[in-house]
Every structure is written in structure tokens, then in C-alpha cells.
């Protein structure tokens, strides 16, 4: 970043309306360590709570955190913190509250839905504590970071933890933070002991202890550069989010189809899967002596999705294969079992406010030497034009006592890319070579 642009980022001010309110009380919190205490004392004036309120009655709907950049009136936070008033500004409005209890309205300037970031404008300026200089701080695995925010709406707090590298399983880089990030801290900063911004608090795993994630500071820096060059905020953030989701699905599908799908044996078939850093596969066999059939499962899915709203996460692909084998059923009863399993699949309904009802077509096709019954269902996003959910369900028809049932789900893709995925998936099925694997 040149010095002129850096000055623009730290001094840029936007005109936005705000209204003061009385000081609010916060719950007492245990004292932090001396290093954390020093950081909090230096940074507390630049930490904000970001609230989403109903316009009617101004009752609180959701809360998160944010932080002022330099001496400007620009605030960095998470997209998911502001998503309600970004997508539905007629119903929701944003508000900031600082550590002294002062508050005011916010204006949304920019969003990055792919990295879960947003930039706001408020009617107060920072003290200059949080900066986004170039180059950014270099992190070493194991070094301590300090996360700031307002956990569970209990009061502003600071927590300590260790930086443990970049997570590759997410489609976009995230930093692993081995420390507590609780609800309400999303959008707050995580800093080094010197106060340099390392990342933005974003999420945590619910199935582990102290496994939390940060958005790398470089993505916030890029969004601030974008704000510095724009003359006014976008008039319609739904259109902005749509364009970013279309960008994501192009990259996602191109990466998935860059090489042929891998084939895994599920005798007597070979089934298409994709295993990568972003997409993991798991298998399971369910054979019980008291059951007249056996089931083998293989599931592959992306481990992350794009948060759009509290009711919608998208930009994700999953593959499932299920092999049913008769161990004590005749052909008629096994056919009934396999048909019931096929009919049990759910493709959604037309009562969904997010997507249209499924439009489905059914055909009998042949993939190499494997005859298949195939059902393709497509649903359009009501609010995000050009995006669709594709669901392809197949069942083998060549074995009287074996049924391979497979499903491909592609969420948040263009119509063209949905067809690309389904064609590649259908074309990949094959029979195991005679005499075993090659």
C-alpha cells in the first residue's frame, strides 16, 4: 500500500446519521493477564458492539463486535453480523455501542460475503490503535494472540489464545486460534502482543474445545482499499452478494472439475468421488445379523459453506453413495426395499421462502456399462438471481439383489455449472473390472 492510500484508509470519513443514547451497564468479568490487561486498556476505546435492530420498535435481533480503523470513522466487522440490515434494510437497521455506553446508527459501506467481512461507517472516530499497515504482521505458530469483543452480550472482554496456522479445509484461508471466541465476539479483532491486527474473529467449532477461527487481516485490508476508492456505498447489497456468490461458484466448480473425478470401488461398481483439502470423504458399513440386508455408505462433502443469512448457507457440494445388498431377501422384497429408499429422498417444497419448489425430470440413462435411473431436480433462489440448487439422484438397475443409490447436491451454482456437474457425475459411473481392480 502506498502512503497516500494508507492515509486515505486511516483518515477517510463518511457522513452518516447517528443518535446518542444513555450509557448501558455490563456484567462484571474476571480480570485478564497483565499483557491482556495492557492491550485492553489501550484498545478499549476503539472496540464496538454492532447490533442489528428491528426498525419497528428498535428491539435487538442480533449482536456482534467490530473495531475502528486508525483515526477514521470506519469499522471492520463480519458480514454475518450485518447480514440482516444488508439484505433487508426495510426491516432492520444497524447500531453501534462503545465501551462507555455511547451509541449511534451505522451505515454499511461494503461487504465481502466470501470472507465474511463488512465495513461500516459510524459517527465517531477511532483513537488510532487498530491499524492495517502494509506489510501486515507476520505470525509464527504458537505465538499468543488476544481476541477482543462482547461475548454473549455480557460486556466487552479480551481472551488469550495461540495462533496455530492457516486452515486449508475452508475454501478460503482462515487462521486457527486456540482460544475462546464466543457468540457476540464475531467481528472483533484478534491482535498480537504488540497490538498488530492478525485477524477478525469469525467462528468456532462446537464439537471441540477452544478451536476457533479468524479471517486473515489481509482480506479486511483489501476491503478497506475498496472502500477508499468508492464514491458512495452500493444502493443494493443483495446485488453485491449475488455477484460475489456467482464468483464463488465459478471458482468452486472449476476447481472440482479441473481433473476427472476419482473412482472408488463399491463392488460391483466404481463410483465417482472427489477428495481434496476442501472436500473430505467418509465411509461406513452397516451389516447386522438380524437384518436381511446390508448397507455400505460413502459420503463426501465440502467442510465449509458461504454464510448468506441466518436461514441460508450455500456454495457447497456434496456426494453420497449407498450400496444396498440383500442378505436374506428375495428379489421382490428387495425391490420394494430399494424403491422405498429411493422414494424417501427429499428435494424441498414450494413453501420455502428462500428457493422455488423443485422442478424435476426423470430418465433412464447408461453410464459406460452401468444402467441408471436418474432424477434431476433444480430449485432457483428467489432473492439471488442466477443461482440454483441442483440435486441428482441415481439408482442402478442391472442387479436384482444389489442397488447402488447415489446423490449429488450442488448448492448455489449457476444453471450452466449445475449441468456441468451433473453430466460429469453421471458419466463417471463404471463397473469393477472383471477379475478385480486393475
Question: Each PLM stretch: what is its role?
Answer:
Residues 66-68, 106-108, 163, 280:
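Conserved hydrophobic positions within beta-strands
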Amino acid at each position: 500500500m502506498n502512503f497516500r492510500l494508507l492515509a486515505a484508509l486511516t483518515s477517510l470519513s463518511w457522513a452518516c446519521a447517528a443518535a446518542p443514547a444513555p450509557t448501558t451497564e455490563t456484567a462484571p468479568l474476571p480480570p485478564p493477564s497483565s499483557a491482556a490487561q495492557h492491550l485492553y486498556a489501550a484498545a478499549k476505546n476503539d472496540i464496538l458492539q454492532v447490533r442489528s435492530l428491528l426498525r419497528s420498535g428498535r428491539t435487538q435481533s442480533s449482536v456482534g463486535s467490530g473495531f475502528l480503523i486508525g483515526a477514521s470513522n470506519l469499522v471492520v466487522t463480519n458480514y454475518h453480523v450485518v447480514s440482516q440490515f444488508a439484505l433487508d434494510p426495510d426491516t432492520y437497521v444497524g447500531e453501534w455501542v462503545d465501551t462507555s455506553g455511547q451509541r449511534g446508527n451505522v451505515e454499511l459501506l461494503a461487504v465481502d460475503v466470501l470472507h465474511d467481512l463488512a465495513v461500516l461507517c459510524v459517527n465517531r472516530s477511532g483513537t488510532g490503535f487498530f491499524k492495517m499497515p502494509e506489510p501486515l504482521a507476520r505470525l509464527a505458530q504458537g505465538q499468543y494472540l488476544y481476541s477482543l469483543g462482547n461475548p454473549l452480550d455480557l460486556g466487552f472482554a479480551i481472551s488469550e489464545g495461540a495462533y496455530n496456522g492457516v486452515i486449508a479445509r475452508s475454501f478460503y484461508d482462515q487462521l486457527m486460534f486456540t482460544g475462546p471466541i464466543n457468540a457476540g465476539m464475531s467481528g472483533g479483532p484478534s491482535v498480537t502482543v504488540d497490538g498488530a491486527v492478525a485477524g477478525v474473529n469469525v467462528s468456532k467449532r462446537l464439537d471441540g474445545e477452544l478451536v476457533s477461527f479468524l479471517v486473515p487481516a489481509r482480506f479486511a485490508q483489501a476491503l478497506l482499499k475498496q472502500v477508499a476508492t468508492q464514491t458512495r456505498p452500493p444502493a443494493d447489497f443483495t446485488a453485491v452478494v449475488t455477484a460475489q456468490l456467482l464468483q464463488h461458484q465459478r471458482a468452486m466448480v472449476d476447481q472440482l472439475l479441473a481433473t476427472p473425478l476419482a473412482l472408488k470401488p463399491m463392488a460391483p461398481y466404481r463410483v465417482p468421488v472427489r477428495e481434496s483439502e476442501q472436500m473430505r470423504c467418509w465411509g461406513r458399513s452397516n451389516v447386522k445379523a438380524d437384518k436381511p440386508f446390508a448397507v455400505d455408505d460413502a459420503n463426501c462433502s465440502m467442510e465449509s459453506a458461504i454464510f448468506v443469512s441466518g436461514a441460508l448457507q450455500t456454495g457447497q457440494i456434496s456426494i453420497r453413495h449407498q450400496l444396498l445388498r440383500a442378505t436374506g431377501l428375495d428379489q421382490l422384497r428387495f425391490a420394494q426395499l430399494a424403491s422405498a429408499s429411493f422414494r424417501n429422498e427429499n428435494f424441498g417444497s414450494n413453501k420455502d421462502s428462500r428457493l422455488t419448489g423443485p422442478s424435476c425430470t426423470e430418465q433412464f440413462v447408461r453410464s459406460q456399462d452401468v444402467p441408471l435411473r436418474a432424477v434431476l431436480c433444480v430449485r432457483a433462489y428467489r432473492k439471488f438471481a442466477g443461482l440454483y440448487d441442483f440435486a441428482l439422484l441415481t439408482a442402478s438397475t442391472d442387479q436384482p439383489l444389489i442397488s447402488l443409490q447415489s446423490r449429488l447436491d450442488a448448492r448455489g451454482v449457476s444453471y450452466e455449472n449445475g449441468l456441468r456437474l451433473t453430466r460429469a457425475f453421471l458419466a463417471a459411473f463404471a463397473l469393477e473390472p472383471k477379475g478385480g481392480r486393475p
